Curated annotation (Swiss-Prot):
InterPro entries in alphabetical order: US22-like
GO cellular component, one term: host cell nucleus
Biased composition (Low complexity): 275-304
Stretches for region Disordered: 247-305
The protein's name in its UniProt record: Apoptosis inhibitor UL38
Keywords, comma-separated and alphabetical: Host cytoplasm, Host nucleus, Host-virus interaction, Modulation of host cell apoptosis by virus
Length: 331
């Protein structure tokens, strides 16, 4: 009986090792094909799809390699082309190479599905619930990186940006977020290795990046796909409805000036630099006299009743004192 048990364990170990080697070869083939171009990548994906390949990610998730002809795909080609046009700063073609799925017992279709794309410039994205998430700047880094679906690496469609402020405005911003997440992931792994070999070490603090990585790992250990927006505070703080409900933004936050007034209009003196307001600039000294409002006209304007608000789509512009215009977003 003992001999049979040892033989079974040895066979299972050999099978696991063979599966691991085959996975590494398939992942290497995908990485090489992605470097050669989109035609080579599509050919490699179709070849693996015919084999029914399911490759294991370093996080523990299994990626089903497939193209848009996949039987259980929950989006069509028109949706993919729509994402290519409505999710700036993305301005490239999306090449599908796999999905990460969650199945319930006896379900006809997947209960949740992450669709994986790569662009001709090697950027890897995941699509979930109408939003694109930047995962890695290359195919090789994707297979060893963290699967995090947060506000910082999200690309919201332009139709949604009237309700939420985008964090990343360029692809460089997304790459910077990836490197920050990768750094925190390496620190966590090094701390775990040190804890197993020597005295126990503790983290100085747990920031939002670490919290998102730990929550993603916990969900994967439970056999689930990482959830979106673990850090709800960042998403809520950049919701335009929340900003309007909490009132005006503080004057010491220059990054939030766009939310208090349109960029084409002058800002109030209280929101500008106090030193600049106290010291007259050269441009102000050279202002022609015709641009100065006479005192009689100014008193006439101040005594006149306020103008009614003008509604333009979902933005209300209300005339205030002087030339200052306040923007109110209606959600």
């Amino acid at each position: 009986m003992t001999t049979t048990t040892h033989s079974t364990a040895a066979i299972m170990s050999l099978l696991d090792e063979a599966e691991w080697r085959q996975t590494q070869m398939d992942v290497g083939g995908l990485i090489q094909a992605s470097a050669l171009g989109k035609v080579a990548l599509r050919y490699a994906v179709r070849k693996l799809m015919k084999r029914g390949a399911r490759l294991r990610h370093d996080s523990g998730l299994y990626v089903c390699i497939c193209d848009p002809s996949y039987e259980f795909l929950q989006m069509n080609l028109s949706k993919i082309s729509w994402l290519e046009r409505h999710c700036p700063p993305l301005d490239q073609e999306l090449i599908m190479f796999g999905v990460i799925e969650a199945w319930e017992e006896a379900s006809v279709r997947p209960t949740r599905q992450l669709v994986l794309f790569m662009t001709p410039k090697w950027d890897v994205f995941a699509y979930d619930s109408g939003i694109l998430f930047f995962l890695a700047p290359s195919m090789a880094q994707f297979w060893h990186g963290a699967i995090v679906l947060e506000y910082w690496n999200a690309l919201f469609p332009v139709e949604v940006r009237s309700h939420v402020r985008q964090h990343a405005h360029t692809m460089d911003d997304l790459v910077m977020v990836f490197h920050q997440l990768d750094y925190e992931k390496q620190v966590l792994e090094a701390r775990r290795d040190k804890n197993t070999e020597g005295p126990r070490t503790f983290a100085k603090s747990v920031n939002s990046y670490v919290r998102a990585i730990l929550e993603s790992e916990r969900r994967i250990r439970e056999g689930k796909i990482p959830m979106t927006f673990v850090d709800r505070d960042s998403l809520r703080a950049n919701s335009l409805a929340h900003i309007q409900a909490t009132g005006a933004q503080p004057s010491h936050a220059p990054a939030q000036r766009v939310l208090s007034a349109p960029p084409s209009l002058p800002l109030p003196v209280s929101e500008e630099d106090p030193a600049a307001a106290a010291t007259p600039s050269s441009s102000a000294a050279t202002t022609p006299p015709s641009s100065v409002v006479p005192a009689s006209v100014e008193s006439e304007l101040s005594s006149s009743p306020p103008l009614p608000p003008v509604v333009v789509k979902d933005v209300v512009y209300t005339a205030g004192e002087g030339d200052v215009v306040q923007m109110v977003v209606v959600v």
